[in-house]
C-alpha cells in the first residue's frame, strides 16, 4: 500500500517524508480494521481509501491559512487526521457527536503518536469558541448555509471556513447569508477519483 500511496502522491505533485507516508498508511490500516466493527465509512477497500479519503483530504493543505483548525463533523477523522499528518506544525481539533467515532480518533492519536490533534465529542453548536480558530473545515458535513450558521462562533476575526464539496454548489453559494461571502473556489485534482472536487473558502463580512 505504501508503494501505491507514493505513486498517487507523485501523480498529485505532493511531496511527503517517508515518516508521513508511513503514518498515512497506518491510519488507513486502522480505519480498515475498525470499520468492520464500527462502520465508520462506506469505503471498504483500503486501496480505495487511499484515493477517496487520504488524497481527497490532503490536496486541501496548500490552501489552509493559520495554525489552529477545527474539523467539524470529522467522522473517522476526515479530513483532519490526514491534514494533521502532512501539516505537523498546525493543530487540528476533531469534533464529532458520536462516541464510537471519537473512541477511534483517540486510538489513532495514541497509536500514531499524533500530538497535534484533539478529538472532542460534542455537537458543533455547543462547542465553545475560545480561543477562536484560524479555520473551520468540513467535508460532506452540511450545506454551506448550515455550516456558517452552526459554526459562526468558531473562527477568529480573520478566520475562514473551508468546505470540501463535490460539484460546484452554486445554489448553496447563492443562498449564503449576507454576513458571509465566498472568498474563492478552488478546483481540486485528486488522482484516480471520479467526479469533480471543489474547495469553497468563505469569510465573514462582519467588521
Curated annotation (Swiss-Prot):
Q: Write the record's keywords in alphabetical order, separated by commas.
A: Cytoplasm, Methyltransferase, rRNA processing, S-adenosyl-L-methionine, Transferase
Write down the top EC class of this protein: transferase
Q: Which reaction does it catalyse?
A: guanosine(527) in 16S rRNA + S-adenosyl-L-methionine = N(7)-methylguanosine(527) in 16S rRNA + S-adenosyl-L-homocysteine
Q: Which SUPFAM superfamilies match?
A: S-adenosyl-L-methionine-dependent methyltransferases (SSF53335)
Q: List the Pfam families.
A: GidB
Q: Name one GO cellular component term.
A: cytosol
Looking up NCBIfam families in the UniProt record yields: rsmG_gidB
Q: Which family does it belong to?
A: Belongs to the methyltransferase superfamily. RNA methyltransferase RsmG family.
Give the protein name, as stated in the record.
Answer: Ribosomal RNA small subunit methyltransferase G
Amino acid at each position: 500500500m505504501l508503494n501505491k500511496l507514493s505513486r498517487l502522491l507523485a501523480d498529485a505533485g505532493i511531496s511527503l517524508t517517508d515518516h508521513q507516508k508511513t503514518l498515512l498508511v497506518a491510519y488507513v490500516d486502522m480505519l480498515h480494521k475498525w470499520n468492520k466493527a464500527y462502520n465508520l465509512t462506506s469505503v471498504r477497500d483500503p486501496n480505495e481509501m487511499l484515493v477517496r479519503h487520504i488524497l481527497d483530504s490532503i490536496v486541501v493543505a496548500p490552501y489552509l491559512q493559520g495554525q489552529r483548525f477545527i474539523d467539524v463533523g470529522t467522522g473517522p477523522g476526515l479530513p483532519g487526521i490526514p491534514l494533521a499528518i502532512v501539516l505537523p506544525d498546525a493543530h487540528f481539533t476533531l469534533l464529532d457527536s458520536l462516541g464510537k467515532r471519537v473512541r477511534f480518533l483517540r486510538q489513532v492519536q495514541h497509536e500514531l503518536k499524533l500530538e497535534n490533534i484533539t478529538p472532542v465529542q460534542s455537537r458543533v453548536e455547543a462547542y465553545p469558541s475560545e480561543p477562536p480558530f484560524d479555520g473551520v473545515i468540513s467535508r460532506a458535513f452540511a450545506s454551506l448555509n448550515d455550516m456558517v450558521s452552526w459554526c459562526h462562533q468558531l473562527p477568529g476575526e480573520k478566520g475562514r471556513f473551508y468546505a470540501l464539496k463535490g460539484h460546484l454548489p452554486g445554489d448553496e453559494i447563492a443562498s449564503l447569508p449576507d454576513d458571509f461571502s465566498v472568498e474563492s473556489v478552488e478546483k481540486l485534482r485528486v488522482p484516480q477519483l471520479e467526479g469533480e472536487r471543489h474547495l469553497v473558502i468563505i469569510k465573514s463580512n462582519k467588521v
